Structure formats: C-alpha cells, structure tokens
Amino acid sequence: MNITFIGSGYVGLVSGVMMSYLGHNVTCLDNDEAKISKLNKRILPIYETKLDKYFTQALEHERLKFTSFYNEELKNTEAVFITVGTPSKASGEADLSYVYEAIDKISLHINKDCLIVIKSTVPPNSCNNIINYLKEKGFSFNVASNPEFLREGNAVEDFLYPDRIVIGVNNKESEDILRKIYMPLTDNGAELVITDLVTAELIKYGSNSFLATKIAFINEMANLCEKIGADIKNLSKGIGLDKRIGTAFLNAGPGFGGSCFPKDILALNSIIKNNYIDSKILEAVIRSNKERPSLMVDKIATLLDEDLKGKNIAVLGLTYKAGTDDVRASPAIEIIKNLLDKGTYVKAFDPMGLENSQKTFQNENLLYLDSAIKVCDSSDAIIITTEWSEFQALDWQKIYSLVKTPIIIDLRNILKADEVESIGFRYYTVGSKI
C-alpha cells in the first residue's frame, strides 16, 4: 500500500522505516527541511537500536522517500498517518496545534478515499473533533486512531513483535484498510485490538500512566528500603514474579523521563480534572517523580558529608534511558542542574546523548567530555544516571587509579557491588541502606 507519515520525528521515522520493511511504499513528510536533507543523504537524525539496518534496506528497495512538500504525491496515498508532536501546555493539556496544522495541509491534497490515521498521542474525543472540524470545512474523510507503543531503545523489536496493535475506528472501511496495513504482523501472531475511537485514544494514556505509576511506586519502596535496610533488587523481584504484576518497570532509579511518560500522565491528569473527577493517584505520581532528582542529589550530599560546594562530580549517563539519544525530560539532566545549583563542578558523558545534551543544557561549571575515563579523572564521586551496558564494561581498576575519592553512587543499580568494592571503591545504590 501507499502510506504517508506526516512528521518524521521519533515515532514517524521509526514507523515509516518499519512499514516499508513490511512491504509498503512509504513517504515521510516533515516541515524540517534540514532533517529531510539529512535523511535524503541516508543520515539518520536519531539513534535507535537496529534502525539503521532497516533504514538502509528500505532505501535500497526504493520503498522509502522523504520530502518536506505537501504535493501531488499525496493524491496517491491510501492512508496518511499523523505522527507530529503533541507537547504539554502550561496547564498539562496536550497541545494539538501541530495535529490540526497537518490536517489542514493534507486535506487539500489527499483523495476522498484516503484514511487519516491519528498516531500522535491525543486526548479522548480528538478523532471525533477532527471529523467534525473537517466536515465544517466541507471534507468527509474517514479518521481512525492507531496509538503507538514503541519503547525508545527497543522500538524495532516492539514494531515487529508488538504486544498488541490497537485501532479505533467508526466504520468498516477504516478497519479494512488498517487490517490490510498490519496484515504482515497479524499473520505472524500479533493481536489486533479493534475498538471505538475514544477508547483507542484513552488506551495510550492509560498504558503510559500505569507504567509511570509502577516506576513511582518502586522508587518509593526504594526510599523505604534505604531506611529499614531491605534489599530493593530482591524486593522488586519478589513483587514482579507475581504474574498479576510482572517485573517490567520495577527497577528503582532516578525517576522516569523521555517524550511520553511525563507528558502523557500530565495530559491524562488534566483530562480527568476537566471531567470533574478527583485524580489523587496520578497527582501523587507526578509529584513523586518531580521530586525524585532532588531526592537523588540529597542522597549524594549525604554520602559526600553534606557539603557539595566545590566538589568535582562525574556523571555517567545523560539520556533518560539506555538505547536512545533522547534527553527530553531526562532525570540525569535534572540531577546535573540540581548538583550545579549546590555549587559543584560537573563533568558528564553519555555514549549516545552528548550532542542532544549540549543542545539542551549548558552551564559554565558543566563540561561534556567524549569518554567515561576522562569524566572520572580527579572526581570526588562518580554518579551513574543511565543504565548503559557500556558502564558495566568500563575498566574500573583503571578508573580507581584516576579518581580523587573512590566513591560510586549508582542510581541505576547496574554494577556488581563485590567487583567494584574489591577494587577499593565505596559503592552505593538506590534502595540500599546509607
């Protein structure tokens, strides 16, 4: 089928590349001409595990094109996916201005049988509102909801082997088109959840907010473990092996970040409030996660004898999680800001997130370096803020010989305590008694 993606950010680009792998002819359209220029030069503007392989393959098979022009090509598309951003307003509500901008532009070019698919995360009833908006302008396109559930760092596998594919439709024609698009995956065993438009939209918000709640819960359990001497790793395992709960998202750490969880839980909380419902759970999760970076810095201060002023801190990890170059709402960046506010000097490294971090945040007392070894040299403490496997494989014996004070504060609990302690490091984790 001929498919177009409007918006070539993380979701649009990954989905476009992988749709072409399924055999569809895909055009990715974006207003950012510099990004499109890069893509046409076969340069991926994001890092995502394994994506480069499928990107190259799609281009070689001539099933993937990039453009910044809304033109005649859209007349041949059978489905156009809206994958633009829906950032948070100050109120927490989702800003749909980019969605409506895309709708306005494509409605002038697509044919009457083309299906508009909203893949951007939008509040419940957005698709119905878009249908009414188009009718007011004299258009009668079918509109469907198809939320994405790709995890950054694991997006390729998530696309190929999804837990479920959710589609929200209000007629058989829309359902048939989406069934045809996803047939290569459903024939391979992927479960298709077909529902109405509003429910499909709400599934995405509910899923992300529930996962965020699991993270906030285990972080609060880690706080308790530190007070009473319990072991957070075994606690997480003992809870998570209950099949009703599951082990995913039960790793204690510095909090959740990224482009989805913080934004989506704020939006869902706003939706609930706007419907005159008291949202105690979500508000508690939002507050707990917002406070998490400062709690981590308080922990660091306690371990470094309270006064952080003038300390040289090495920070390993800038992205909000491993496997991506995304630093949006990253706990690591917030921790660095808190450390700088307390008068520290920070050197930071990340295997994939350096460039985005440098664009996002600069400070005269913050130095970004291109290796973990350089960052750790002469440090008063090493803070691990992202769970990159590269940090587990570092030459800790060599690092021990370079540091000023042999202290590791592992906010991701990824190192083996006996190994680094046998070298001579004082090693502290999240969820261990201070």
Swiss-Prot record:
InterPro entries: 6-PGluconate_DH-like_C_sf, NAD(P)-bd_dom_sf, UDP-Glc/GDP-Man, UDP-Glc/GDP-Man_DH_C, UDP-Glc/GDP-Man_DH_C_sf, UDP-Glc/GDP-Man_DH_dimer, UDP-Glc/GDP-Man_DH_N, UDPglc_DH_bac. Pathway: Nucleotide-sugar biosynthesis; UDP-alpha-D-glucuronate biosynthesis; UDP-alpha-D-glucuronate from UDP-alpha-D-glucose: step 1/1. Disulfide bonds: none annotated. Pfam families: UDPG_MGDP_dh (PF00984), UDPG_MGDP_dh_C (PF03720), UDPG_MGDP_dh_N (PF03721). NAD(+) binds at residues 2-19, 30, 35, 121, 152, 263, 328. GO terms for molecular function: NAD binding; UDP-glucose 6-dehydrogenase activity. PANTHER family: UDP-GLUCOSE 6-DEHYDROGENASE TUAD. Belongs to the UDP-glucose/GDP-mannose dehydrogenase family. This is UDP-glucose 6-dehydrogenase. It comes from Rickettsia bellii (strain RML369-C).
